[in-house]
Amino acid sequence: MLIKIPSRSDCSESEVTSETLYLSRRRLLGASFAGLALASGLPRLGFADEQRYAGVESVPAPGWFAEKLPQTRWQAVNVQGEAITPFKDATHYNNFYEFGPNKGDPAENASALKAEPWSVVIDGEVGKPGTYALEDFVKPYQLEERIYRLRCVEAWSMVIPWLGFPLADLLKRVEPNGQAKFVRFETLQRPEQMVGQRSGFSVIDWPYMEGLRMDEAMHPLAILAVGMYGRLLPNQNGAPLRLVVPWKYGFKSIKSIVRISLVREQPKTTWESIAANEYGFYANVNPQVDHPRWSQARERRLPSGLFSPNVRDTQMFNGYGSEVASLYSGMDLRKYY
């Protein structure tokens, strides 16, 4: 079923911006990855409907992706003051610490990742556990284009047109039992292809882990994405399969997923394990709850430069409050951040 997202949550694909300002993330991950850098180059992408967006390169797609595109449900719903971030900027300003700590590292290093073949393990409190080849994993679902805001915890944001399907559709198919209260996600651990996982300076205990409460995972806005900008996901953006939860800070939208587990207890997520006072389990976008070292009241919508700042007020739940606020009814969102 096509989810019709209200206009205040949608963005027009006809408006395009670019981004030039790079902001280094906090120094928590520390030292340089110099000497470990891999050969640069964009990963294999897919022929699709990339002519809808400027500057999108064309590279042949795997058969399963090409077969699904003709039935894709494309969206283009206008909202005042929003603009889609250009493809090049969205693919060259990333946090993906498996490939390095700096914003340009994923685009430079992620070409080393071999995203084919790929399999996903489904386990835990489900009636249909198993290990699925990606093409079989995606086969039952019709792709939809979802134009979502992406708000990073670092107080910058983008607008990205994703291609994917509702996470809820997958969860229903694997038949969670009554003990399933949370969903835990796990990123690939393959240090021979992910330079960041080889660094002795990283504070991350690989593999990267994330989690959602079951009702959050079942919400129709939460999707599993396999593409963006009318084509296959680039490696640096989480190929071949990533989570997108638009009302939460970007680190919740885990990339390069290899395992989805339905569990009884709230999972301990990666950033929560590193600094729970800075990165809570819920991580809902909230302008009233600051990061300990910076304000969350405003954000830089990329592009944004010293002499041409593109700064705007941050919206509660990233502008999706009318859809998701009821999930947190009665909760103290200053405590459960």
Curated annotation (Swiss-Prot):
Residues binding Mo-molybdopterin: N94, Y97, E98, C152, T187, N237, R242, S253, I254, K255
Biological process terms in GO annotation: protein repair
Pfam families: Oxidored_molyb
Keywords of this entry: Metal-binding, Molybdenum, Oxidoreductase, Periplasm, Signal
Catalysed transformations (reactions): L-methionyl-[protein] + a quinone + H2O = L-methionyl-(S)-S-oxide-[protein] + a quinol; L-methionyl-[protein] + a quinone + H2O = L-methionyl-(R)-S-oxide-[protein] + a quinol
EC numbers on record: 1.8.5.-
Record's GO cellular component terms: periplasmic space
Signal peptide: 1-48
Co-factor note (free text): Binds 1 Mo-molybdopterin (Mo-MPT) cofactor per subunit.
Superkingdom of origin organism: Bacteria
Molecular function via GO: metal ion binding; molybdopterin cofactor binding; oxidoreductase activity, acting on a sulfur group of donors, quinone or similar compound as acceptor
InterPro entries linked: MsrP, OxRdtase_Mopterin-bd_dom, OxRdtase_Mopterin-bd_sf
Cell compartment(s), UniProt: Periplasm
Cofactor (UniProt): Mo-molybdopterin
Primary location group: periplasm
Post-translational modification: Predicted to be exported by the Tat system. The position of the signal peptide cleavage has not been experimentally proven.
Family under the similarity heading: Belongs to the MsrP family.
Subunit comment: Heterodimer of a catalytic subunit (MsrP) and a heme-binding subunit (MsrQ).
Described purpose of this protein according to its UniProt entry: Part of the MsrPQ system that repairs oxidized periplasmic proteins containing methionine sulfoxide residues (Met-O), using respiratory chain electrons. Thus protects these proteins from oxidative-stress damage caused by reactive species of oxygen and chlorine generated by the host defense mechanisms. MsrPQ is essential for the maintenance of envelope integrity under bleach stress, rescuing a wide series of structurally unrelated periplasmic proteins from methionine oxidation.
Protein name as it appears in the record: Protein-methionine-sulfoxide reductase catalytic subunit MsrP
